[in-house]
Amino acid sequence: MINIDPHFIHNLTNKLKTFDNFSLYVHVNPDFDAFGAAFAFKAFLAVYFPHKKAYVMGSHNIKADGKDLFPFEAAPIDDAFVKNSLAIIFDTSNQERVLTQKHKLAKETVRIDHHPKTESFADLEWIDPAFSAAAEMVGYLILQMGYELNAEMAAYIYAGIITDTQRFSSSATTPQTFALTAKLLETGFNRNKVHDAVYLKPLLEHKYFSYVLNKAKITPNGLAYALLKKGTYKQFGVVSPLPMVHALNNIKGVKIWTTCYFNEDIKKWIGSIRSRSIPINNFAQMFGGGGHKYAAAFVLDDKRQFMKLVEIMDDFLAKQKHVNS
């Protein structure tokens, strides 16, 4: 069993006993890890603190991925509830990326995150990049506090882990990841349901995947990139725009890959960067983004900034190529 900071455990345990209301937060454009962590914690509260109330903020508005697995809220949560709540923020590296921003209304805030620390914005924080996923952190947290995992918690945690580790294939996967996964499997949760929720996509989304792959350009230095036109996703019947960076995974000779699309809700360009072994979060940070060593994201005001980012990364790869030649 790993050891979590006893100061964090002690303080969080006291807050769980003190507060009756819990507002749970994820990052903008939430993925299965963010939701997996938040809904696993909500399920934990429902079992061990049944008289307390908890809601995952902003989940009532989610249109796409996750609705077949997570019990999204039916309606927005009233500010009066939030003002009397303990806000717990999951999988979010900086304050401006907290979905709804309602955490600022809460009485106190807690943050649980596995991204490299770039800022502090909660009263109590547990930040540890050694974990493969925020959901993995929640699983260990529940166990470390002396509670058991049930099948519902396990399903949500497993969804988060397989998403952020790319089915246990990424370098972020550790022995502790497999150790927790073994405990999750012991609960007997329905793995097929989780796999279907995470991986099954409509035919039109597969066609969109192919479109992105065909749209991509690959430089001689090993950079693959795709800049998607505004509204492209609509012609494929996709409910909301997606980064689709995974369309460029596993191309031989490609060392770094990135995509960028226009988000009509926030009127900005959103992009993702991935690599297998080259640290790329520093590139995202140059443009106000951030993330993990090999997986990062950014938000831009102008698509020309994306092409500048492409130029910077390609120059970096060219220099690496020269050094290694």
UniProtKB/Swiss-Prot annotation:
It comes from the Bacteria. One of its GO terms (molecular function) is nucleic acid binding. InterPro entries: DDH_dom, DHH_sf, DHHA1_dom, Oligoribo/pAp-PDE_c-di-AMP_PDE. Belongs to the mgp1/MG371 family. This is Uncharacterized protein MG371 homolog. It comes from Mycoplasma pneumoniae (strain ATCC 29342 / M129 / Subtype 1) (Mycoplasmoides pneumoniae). The lineage of its organism: Bacteria, Bacillati, Mycoplasmatota, Mycoplasmoidales, Mycoplasmoidaceae.
